[in-house]
């Protein structure tokens, strides 16, 4: 189903798949990384089945062969125009994108860097030097910091979108991917300030808000008719799937891993102790209101919510098995 470097973002039974996403192909690369982590002895399979696809993606994205993606002189990707919605924040209301993110969205830049860095490592392992990008990667890290780093009276964080002539400085969770991906584009000494801002503005017991409450356009509740709900979908509404990236970033930045694991388990306790008995019984909803009490909404059993919550638990168990076992035992007894 790969076509001109693009992975479908929607599969159709009749074969007319949708290819209107800038990030699906880059998430494919991440999925291959997860497979390699889980099955380190299957590098031969990756070379045979996945490596050609990854090279196809990089060739088309980096060569300007994807209609809505254009590489710039520094190696980053500009996507879309004011009338498109090509990232996961893709809601449309009254014929216009609710969350315009044309230009260089921070997670697209992070995913692209991660894809290039992974390809560089595979090219080294497979003896294909023509696919190595070491010098380009070093330069991209410096450019990324200059473009996206924001300092205001409340601290430092990463802008959500960079465009020629300015940046979107609203605080959104997409900046987490610059820390959490296998090859992070942000330098390690910057992690703490980003996480501090995300924790203060976006973190809830059920996931992360899509926009800080102090921002213009913040919608505290997911309610009303279709247009009103679409207006709120990525404008403050909480998404559980983002907990995976948040937990990964916290663990990567942690100087006290056991303490960080305990903090994360305390934070998500209501999600597992209370929510699993609400909405879709035994499952995790798609979204929650941005404001307390964070009522669940959307799909009552959402695959990506479940998947990333399970991945987070796996990461925490791997990082501190004893602490996780204690938490799990208490959870089964109904304790805290």
Label every model-predicted segment.
Residues 1-336:
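Acidic, mature catalytic/reactive cores of soluble proteins
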């Amino acid at each position: 189903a790969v076509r001109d470097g693009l992975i479908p973002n929607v599969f159709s039974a009749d074969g007319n798949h949708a290819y209107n996403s800038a990030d699906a192909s880059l998430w494919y690369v991440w999925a291959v990384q997860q497979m390699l982590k889980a099955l380190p002895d299957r590098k031969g399979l990756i070379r045979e089945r996945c490596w050609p696809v990854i090279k196809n993606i990089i060739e088309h994205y980096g060569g300007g062969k994807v209609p809505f993606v254009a590489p710039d002189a520094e190696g980053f990707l500009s996507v879309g125009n004011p009338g498109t919605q090509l990232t996961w924040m893709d809601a449309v209301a009254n014929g216009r994108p609710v969350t315009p993110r044309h230009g260089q969205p921070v997670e697209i830049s992070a995913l692209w860097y991660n894809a290039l860095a992974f390809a560089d490592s595979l090219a080294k392992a497979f003896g294909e030097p023509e696919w190595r990008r070491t010098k380009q990667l070093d330069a991209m890290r410096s450019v990324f910091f200059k473009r996206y780093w924001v300092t205001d009276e409340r601290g430092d964080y990463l802008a959500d979108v960079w465009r020629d002539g300015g940046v979107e400085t609203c605080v959104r969770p997409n900046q987490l991917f610059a820390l959490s991906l296998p090859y992070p584009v942000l330098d390690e000494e910057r992690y703490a300030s980003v996480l501090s801002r995300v924790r203060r503005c976006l973190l809830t017991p059920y996931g992360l808000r899509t926009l800080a409450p102090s921002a213009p356009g913040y919608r505290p509740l997911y309610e009303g008719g279709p247009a009103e709900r679409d207006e709120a979908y990525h404008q403050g509404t909480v998404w559980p799937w983002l907990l995976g990236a948040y937990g990964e970033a916290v663990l990567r930045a942690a100087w006290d891993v056991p303490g960080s694991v305990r903090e994360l388990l305390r934070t998500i306790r209501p999600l597992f102790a209370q929510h699993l008995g609400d909405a879709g019984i035994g499952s995790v909803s798609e979204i929650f209101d941005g404001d307390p009490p964070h009522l669940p909404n959307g799909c009552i059993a959402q695959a990506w919510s479940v998947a990333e919550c399970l991945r987070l638990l796996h990461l925490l168990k791997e990082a501190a098995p004893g602490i996780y076992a204690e938490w799990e035992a208490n959870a089964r007894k109904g304790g805290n």
